[in-house]
Amino acid sequence: MTAQKLDGTATAAAIKGELTTRVAALHERGIRPGLGTILVGDDPGSRWYVNGKHKDCAEVGIESIRIDLPATATQDEIEDAVRVLNDDPACTGYIVQLPLPKGRDENRVLGLIDPAKDADGLHPTNLGWLVLGKAAPLPCTPNGIVELLRRHGVEIAGAEVTVVGRGVTVGRPLGLLLTRRSENATVTLCHTGTRDLAAHVRGADIVVAAAGVPGIVTGAMVKPGAAVLDVGVSRVDGKLAGDVAPEVWDVARWVSPNPGGVGPMTRAMLLSNIVAMAEQTDS
C-alpha cells in the first residue's frame, strides 16, 4: 500500500480562493479586513513566517499591518505594540509571532490581546469558549487539521484518534475540536511520557503526530489504512524533520507530507479567522 497524500498546499489554495470571494463581498460593503503582526527581533524563521502571512493577505485582498520591533525591545514596548493593535480600527485581528526574545513574558503579552482580535485563537478566553462549545476564533493548526481531513473525505465521526503531543498550539486544543458534536471523534492524547505509545497509535484510525520528536511515529506502530498527519518540526543534522517516519507511507491510507501538509492549512485558517471576524462586524 502506498498512502495517498493529504495535500495541504492544494487544499489551502482552494480555501484562499473561497476567501478571496468573501473578502471581495466585504469590500463591496465598505469593509476592509486587516491582519496585524508583531515581530520582535530578526530571527530568520520568524521573519519568514511573518512575510508568508502578509503574502497570503495580499493574495486574498486582506490589508497588512506590520509592527516590527528590535530584539532589544523591552516588555513595556512589546505590550505597547499590543495596545496599538487593540485600538486600531483598521486591524481586524492580529498575531504576536513567537517565540519572543529571552526574558520577555510571553503569557503576559498574549493575555493582553483583545480576545475579539485574537487571530491565532489561542487567547485564554477563546480557549475557554472552545471548552464551553461557544463560537470564538479557533486555533489555526488544529482547525487546519480538521479541515484537511474533512476536505479529503476522511471519516472523523466515530473515529478513534490518537494525538501525540500536548502543546497548547496543537495537541491540547485539537482534542477539544475533535470531540465537538460536529466531529464526534474519540480522542486519546499521548505525549513523550506515554508508557506504551505504540499501543495507542496502533488502535487509531487517525494519528496526529505533533511532539517535535523526529520519527516518533513509525510504520510498525500504524494500523493499515489509517490517516496519519505529520505536524512535528525539528532539526536533524541541520535539516528539517517531521515526527512521522518514511515507512508510514507504506502502511497508511492517508499521510500529510511535511512540509506541504498541515503548514499551509495553518496559514489558510489564520486568514479564515480574519475574514470571519470581519463578517461578524458587518452582521
Swiss-Prot record:
Pfam families: THF_DHG_CYH (PF00763), THF_DHG_CYH_C (PF02882)
Role noted for this protein: Catalyzes the oxidation of 5,10-methylenetetrahydrofolate to 5,10-methenyltetrahydrofolate and then the hydrolysis of 5,10-methenyltetrahydrofolate to 10-formyltetrahydrofolate.
Taxonomic lineage: Bacteria, Bacillati, Actinomycetota, Actinomycetes, Propionibacteriales
Top-rank taxon: Bacteria
InterPro entries: Aminoacid_DH-like_N_sf (IPR046346), NAD(P)-bd_dom_sf (IPR036291), THF_DH/CycHdrlase (IPR000672), THF_DH/CycHdrlase_cat_dom (IPR020630), THF_DH/CycHdrlase_NAD-bd_dom (IPR020631)
Protein family per UniProt: Belongs to the tetrahydrofolate dehydrogenase/cyclohydrolase family.
Binding-site positions, NADP(+): G165, R166, G167, T192, V233
Protein's recorded name: Bifunctional protein FolD 2
Statement: the UniProt record of this protein carries the keyword Hydrolase: yes
One BP term from GO: tetrahydrofolate interconversion
TM helices/strands, residue ranges: none
EC number: 1.5.1.5, 3.5.4.9
